């Protein structure tokens, strides 16, 4: 059984580790050789503190009786809610846990008056996440973030959009 439960402080250390792993995974998508360091965990703790602010909801993902990840919802204003981050421990992936967690998050968001849509931010290299979100009906492009690297650029893949080449 998969269930979202509101974050509880007793899971702080494990949640900080998962947040650090989440960001480390995203770095690895760019082939960056980043390692988890003490500062990774300090930054993860700061992130956790931000996620506990009133305009956010943080849920732990439970599978059977174990916590296996987290899901973070942000309410930025207006009628759009954001599933800001979702993370499932590596050993529990491809078991439908993220799919069910997103569906449960959609129901949570629907329970708040005034929200008419849900958005995700996803890095283009995270193909697994893109396929999952698309499968769940997230097939409308909204805001596109364009970026200019001021220093070395490790982005070596190209995607065409409106006839223009964009690195990712």
Describe each region flagged by the PLM.
Residues 94-102:
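Glycine-rich acyl-CoA binding loop
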Residues 2-80, 84, 89-90, 102, ...:
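Acetyl-CoA-dependent GNAT
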Residues 109-121:
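Conserved GNAT acetyl-CoA-binding A-motif
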Residues 96, 113, 137:
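Short glycine-rich hinge loops at helix-strand junctions in the catalytic core
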Residues 99, 124-142:
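Conserved active-site alpha-helix within GNAT-family acetyltransferase domains
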Residues 119-129, 147-153:
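Conserved beta-strand-loop-alpha-helix junction that forms the acyl-donor binding cleft
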Residues 89-91, 95, 124-125:
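Active-site acidic-Proline motif in GNAT/NAT acetyltransferases
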């Amino acid at each position: 059984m998969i269930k979202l439960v509101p974050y509880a402080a007793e899971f702080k250390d494990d949640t900080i580790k998962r947040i650090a792993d989440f960001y480390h995974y995203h770095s690895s998508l760019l082939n960056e050789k980043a390692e988890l360091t003490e500062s990774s965990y300090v930054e993860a703790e700061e992130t956790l503190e931000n996620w506990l602010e009133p305009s956010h909801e943080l849920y732990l993902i439970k599978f059977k009786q174990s916590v296996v990840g987290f899901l973070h919802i942000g309410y930025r204003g207006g009628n759009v809610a954001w599933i800001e981050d979702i993370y499932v421990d590596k050993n529990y992936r491809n078991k439908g846990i993220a799919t069910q967690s997103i569906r449960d998050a959609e129901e949570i968001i629907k329970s708040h008056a005034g929200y008419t849509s849900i958005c995700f931010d996803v890095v283009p290299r995270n193909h697994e996440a893109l396929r999952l979100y698309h499968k769940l009906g997230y097939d409308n492009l909204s805001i596109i973030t364009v970026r200019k690297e001021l220093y070395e650029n490790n982005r070596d893949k190209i995607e065409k959009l409106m006839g223009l080449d964009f690195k990712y």
